Design a protein with these regions (language model features):
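Catalytic cores of alpha/beta
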Residues: 124-135, 173-182, 219, 223-242
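Conserved, mostly hydrophobic/aromatic
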Residues: 7, 57, 82, 132, ...
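An N-cap/entry alpha-helix motif that binds or orients negatively charged groups
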Residues: 2-70
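C-terminal helical cap(s) of enzyme catalytic domains, especially alpha/beta-barrels
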Residues: 206-210, 233, 248-262
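Glycine-rich phosphate-binding active-site loops on the catalytic face of alpha/beta enzymes
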Residues: 131-150, 188-197, 235-255
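Active-site beta-loop-alpha junctions enriched in small/polar residues
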Residues: 10, 60-62, 95, 122, ...
């Protein structure tokens, strides 16, 4: 079982435990009644629809490939730095075992900042989408590798009903077709293969032509330099998601400024 399969399986266990505390129907009702006073519906995708490249900046304490990244995880301070530096959106890891994430991180960050947040987790059940809405998320991550096409289509519809966005993650040509058929409006190419952790930034270039221009295109992972940003701009990407590079920067605002202005 590769790491992605392990992450998905652990998500199923987490959901089963969460349902013992709050049932699916209860969570649905809470989500439907949850209103975001600061953001409009579909604020995440609206933030990515601009003439220039949009930046999704990630808050994460650890990862399976790199281990502990930020021992002193000042997540609120980091989110504040990102917003001050001009980030368009913030990605918050909530997966607790391998990424040392927490729902509370998302809840507190979403409450503090005025830009949209995406819940970065391994969605395997509709429960997690309703849960994300209650935590203040403006978007959720849906990974094609761990979902069927039917599930993907259903989950996108649930997101639509809640006024939140779905970032649909793909890794290859087959998943690109799956995402388009399911009705994805935002498609992200993960340049990191979560099955073996190899990184290939050319993956975004390879898959770009398979995605219609009316779909928001996001390049995820492996972005380290201004050269990487220039390459992403050249293929006509709408947005880039940056995690480890910013998390390891001593001055996150300066690093983001450098990348944004490249």
């Amino acid at each position: 079982m590769n790491i992605l399969d392990q992450l998905a399986e652990y998500s199923r266990l987490r959901v089963a435990e969460d349902k013992k505390k709050i049932s699916l129907e209860e969570m649905k009702n809470i989500a439907i009644q949850t209103k975001n006073e600061k953001l409009c519906d579909f604020a995440f995708e609206k933030a990515l629809k601009k003439d220039d490249l949009s930046f999704i900046c990630e808050c994460k304490k650890a990862s399976p490939s790199k281990g502990l990244i930020e021992p002193d995880f000042r997540y609120l301070e980091i989110a504040r730095e990102y917003e001050a530096a001009g980030a368009d959106c913030i990605s918050v890891l909530t997966e607790p075992k391998w990424f040392l994430g927490s729902d509370e991180y998302l809840k507190e960050i979403a409450k503090m900042v005025s830009i949209p947040c995406i819940r970065k987790d391994f969605t395997v059940d509709e429960y997690q989408i309703y849960q994300a809405k209650t935590l203040g998320a403006a978007a959720v991550l849906l990974i094609c590798s761990i979902l069927s096409e039917v599930q993907l289509g259903e989950y996108i519809k649930i997101c639509d009903s809640l006024g939140i966005s779905a970032l649909v993650e793909i890794h290859n040509e087959k998943e690109a077709g799956m995402a388009v058929r399911a009705g994805a409006r935002i498609i992200g190419v993960n340049n990191r293969n979560l099955k073996d952790f190899t990184v290939d930034t050319a993956n975004s270039r390879k898959l770009r032509d398979l995605i219609h221009d009316d779909i928001i295109f996001v390049s995820e992972s492996g972005v380290k330099s201004t050269d990487d940003i220039r390459a992403i701009r050249e293929i006509g990407a709408d947005a880039v998601l940056i995690g480890e590079t910013l998390m390891r920067a001593d001055d996150k605002k300066a690093k983001l400024d450098e990348l944004r202005l490249s």
